Amino acid sequence: MKQSHPIQVLTKALLAAFVLAPFAVAVAHADESLHITFFQIAHADPDGGRLCCSNSSDYVLPGLGINGLPVLNPGGEGGAAAPLDLLGDNEITWWSPTHDSNVTYTGTGIVTLPYANDSFFAVNGTGSLGDGDETYYQAAILSGTLSAPTTENISFSVSSDDMVFVYLDGSIVCDDGGVHAATSVPCITASSVSAGNHTLQVFYVDLDPTGAALEFSVNTEGITTSATPEPSTLAFFGTGLLGLAGFVRRKIGKSA
């Protein structure tokens, strides 16, 4: 009976692992999903409870800052007070424990679209008015890959209490700034989006103790979204492949 060479065994095993890994990731991160990262903002934060009330579709500049955060458009606050949680380049730090001591990372998860939470209080969007805004304000970033089958304009709908900013490939698409009750804001890309994969980011924050809500959906048919694999997921597969390689080498050593 013909036996496979040990090197062939190792090659086939590793190849099979590489082929199957993307399918395993796809199961965990199915279409119409986004990754969500939660933050809570201390009630004592200088921006908490002081930015009411306004609606502004010009609250932030067109692109993200060097730290990957929304950048305030000075004078675009719609008549309300300007935020104080700013870096030198006017990046807003409500989503950055690194740059804001009042912000704390509290967890991650996967959400499906359309997403709707009319009680988006801390902790992690599961609280209520009585136990959420009384101590912390809620912030979150939804992120993932948006896949367009053809080159086209893409339409979204958002509704937020208080603010939400949607970016595609780092450029603003939906700007629902200001502290206000939940309002529905339809928005569409300023120009055609090329077919293929694009980076989607949704920045949400609640800063006033009277309500917290977020709704987000993609209106254009044929568009899919998927949660970007977390580094821990990729590390899992990397560790598994190394372990598999070690196992096969040990088998080769015993058979030699």
What do the predicted segments below correspond to?
Residues 9, 248-251:
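Short, low-complexity interaction segments enriched in Ser/Thr/Pro/Gly
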Residues 252-256:
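Short, charged juxtamembrane terminal tails flanking transmembrane helices
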